[in-house]
Amino acid sequence: MKNQLKHFLLFAVLVVLGTVTAVAQATLKGKVMDAETHEPLIGATVMVKGSAEGTVTDTDGNFTLKVKDGKVMLVFSYVGYNELSRNVKAVGRNVDLGTIALNS
């Protein structure tokens, strides 16, 4: 009986630790602007390459995106502008990418 209890407790601890690891996330934030005019690009798309994760910028060109911890490639795009890809190491709670400038 004691042996079964030990196995059950070990299993429960592993499940809890696995769940905590699975939900480890970083929040990426930044601003997408026109490279020449420095105007914010409203509704620019920010996507994680190879996934359905993404967001669009707000009226000030700002975005926030939650991703799993690790390396990701972000793709920034806007109609009439050249697409820009950027590798990001997403580790920790908040990662500020600063200003992303797109060329038309």
Question: What are the residue ranges of the model-derived segments?
Answer:
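Cleavable N-terminal targeting peptides that direct proteins into the secretory/outer-membrane pathway or into
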Residues: 1-26
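Periplasm-facing N-terminal accessory domains of Gram-negative outer-membrane beta-barrel systems
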Residues: 22-104
